[in-house]
UniProtKB/Swiss-Prot annotation:
Entries under CDD domains matching the protein: ABC_MetN_methionine_transporter
Function noted in UniProt: Part of the ABC transporter complex MetNIQ involved in methionine import. Responsible for energy coupling to the transport system.
Residues where ATP binds: G38, R39, S40, G41, A42, G43, K44, S45
Organism ancestry: Bacteria, Pseudomonadati, Pseudomonadota, Betaproteobacteria, Burkholderiales
The protein's Enzyme Commission number: 7.4.2.11
GO cellular component: plasma membrane
Subunit details: The complex is composed of two ATP-binding proteins (MetN), two transmembrane proteins (MetI) and a solute-binding protein (MetQ).
Organism (species): Burkholderia ambifaria (strain ATCC BAA-244 / DSM 16087 / CCUG 44356 / LMG 19182 / AMMD)
Entry GO MF terms: ABC-type D-methionine transporter activity; ATP binding; ATP hydrolysis activity
Record-given protein name: Methionine import ATP-binding protein MetN 1
Key words, A-Z: Amino-acid transport, ATP-binding, Cell inner membrane, Cell membrane, Membrane, Nucleotide-binding, Translocase, Transport
Amino acid sequence: MIELRNLSQRFPGPTGWVDALHNVNLTIPQGEVFGIIGRSGAGKSTLVRTINLLTRPTEGNVVVGGRDLTLLPAGALREARREIGMIFQHFNLLSSRTVFDNVALPLELAGAGRADIEAAVLPLLDLVGLSAQKDRYPAQISGGQKQRVGIARALASKPKVLLSDEATSALDPETTRSILDLLKRINRELGLTIVLITHQMEVIKQVCDRVAVLDAGRVVEEGRVIDVFLQPHHEVTRALIGDVIAQELPPALKARVAERLKTGSGHLLRLAFTGSGVDQPILSETIRRYELDFNILHGQIDEIQGQAFGSLAVLAGGEPGKVGQALAFLREQGVVVEELSYVE
């Protein structure tokens, strides 16, 4: 288990002290995939680096596996850090070493013998799907394969926790999905706790059990991923989820929708369905009852934490009174309705 207690981090700036983190409190159970999301500059990377004390917090405590890392002497802290692996956006591989030797590096530094190194590294290469590339150099493999080397290297010391700091942000969408699938498999097969930093809500949706939303160094929302997607409370969370919708709309359509919103001639709605509501004709029933025009802009059906989850972005038009009645009816049917004021 990871516990962050009253964590604050201040850095000196050109005009005074800057609060990168402010009174952060989080509890992450063993074996969970926990996401931390926020805009650029929200404090995500600072937060994840406090977990292994790469960045020592100005105030507060970091408890990992029952030990308060902030109280440990240097030698004990080095030992504790061996139980915390980390992967980064940049792969940080040594170009003069093969795939095998890059993965073996932490074990060599720990003084392991060659036989022990081979016994540890070969299964890891098999786990990440790189057995056939073990004798290649970083320049001879793809970006996704380089990140797999980074993951295997982070697992070499048999950590209980894996920290991922924007590990997929430099990868293409298909490679990102394959890396996230690998992280889920590692979590499932090794029982590893994974803390994943990202600015992409799609990444959170694909792999995480729970999520915390960070803004200006503060946790503004936290909960199960399915709950946060269905009913986001904070404006930052709503904007991040709205980005998932907006990114799917062609630029010309975004412009037309934005113009209609300015003139007040339409209502941009996000409708979220879960469970049995996904395959029910709720929308068509609403149109018939209240004589509305629904222009479907974007829709998808996905699965989050084993539950069917449907999301629609629609532009609704009709008499104002009937629009209000229709939204009330949708909510009565268990549909989560959010009226969006803009599309970027």
